[in-house]
């Protein structure tokens, strides 16, 4: 049986030029799959901000760190917060390190 886990959204506040750290938790079956964090745009496309395959969005270069933890968890640390960083982000896992439709 396929189970889709949709955790409750978490609201995170940060100050301009400050920093935030948050955790992402994925199912145990994702332990060996590439992880990613993407920023939702227009409620549809989710642009990868960082992934465990070495990809980083240019806007976040030098400001973001993804730290894998045990049990398919990882933490994300973003510094030098900008107004443009505000928005919705999704944590995920896929062999390509990119979100896939469906």
From Swiss-Prot:
It is found in: Cell membrane; Secreted. It is a single-pass type I membrane protein. Gene3D superfamilies: Immunoglobulins. Keywords: Cell membrane, Immunoglobulin domain, Membrane, Repeat, Secreted, Transmembrane. GO terms for cellular component: extracellular region; plasma membrane. Pfam families: V-set. SUPFAM superfamilies: Immunoglobulin. Its main location: membrane. N-glycosylated. N-glycosylation is required for anchoring IgA molecules to mucus, but is not necessary for Ig binding. Mediates selective transcytosis of polymeric IgA and IgM across mucosal epithelial cells. Binds polymeric IgA and IgM at the basolateral surface of epithelial cells. The complex is then transported across the cell to be secreted at the apical surface. During this process, a cleavage occurs that separates the extracellular (known as the secretory component) from the transmembrane segment. Through its N-linked glycans ensures anchoring of secretory IgA (sIgA) molecules to mucus lining the epithelial surface to neutralize extracellular pathogens. PANTHER family: CMRF35-LIKE MOLECULE 8, POLYMERIC-IMMUNOGLOBULIN RECEPTOR. Interacts (mainly via CDR1-like domain) with dimeric IgA. Interacts (mainly via CDR2-like domain) with pentameric IgM. Either free or part of the secretory IgA (sIgA) complex that consists of two, four or five IgA monomers, and two additional non-Ig polypeptides, namely the JCHAIN and the secretory component (the proteolytic product of PIGR). Free secretory component interacts with bacterial antigens toxA of C.difficile and eaeA of E.coli. This is Polymeric immunoglobulin receptor. It comes from Sus scrofa.
